[in-house]
C-alpha cells in the first residue's frame, strides 16, 4: 500500500527530505538508486498497510510539517465517526495543511495543534507534552462519541534532534 522514507541533511536544511511511493519498496528502482547516497543522523522509514484512505502518495508516511516527521502504525477505532469533530479542534492553518484521508495524518494534526508553533523554542519536553495532549484529545473524542472499537497507536515523531515514540491502546 506504499512506503516512505524521511531523513535530515542538517548541513543544508533543517527541514527533512521525504520520498514517498505507492510501489512496494523492494520493487522501487528510484529507492534502489537513492538509498546508497543517503547519509543522515536521523532517518525514518515506513511501510503502509492501509486502514483508512486510499492508496496514494498523499496517504503515505512519514508525514511532514516544517521540521517534523511523523509515522504511525495501527488504527483509530471509529475514526470515520470522530473525524469531523477532530477537525473542529484544529486551527485553520493546521486544518488547511491536511492533504490526505488517514487517521494517522489527522492524529499528527492534533499533535501539531498542541505543539507551540508560534516561534518559541520547541524541546523534547514540549514535544512530549504535545503528544500527551493529542492522546488526551483523542481519548476525549472517542468517549464523547461512544466509540468502543479499539484504538492502537504506535507513533514516532521527530524534529531531527529529538525522537519520540509511544505505544497506545484503548
PLM region spans:
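Conserved short alpha-helical segments that host acidic/polar catalytic motifs at enzyme active sites
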Residues: 1-72, 77-170
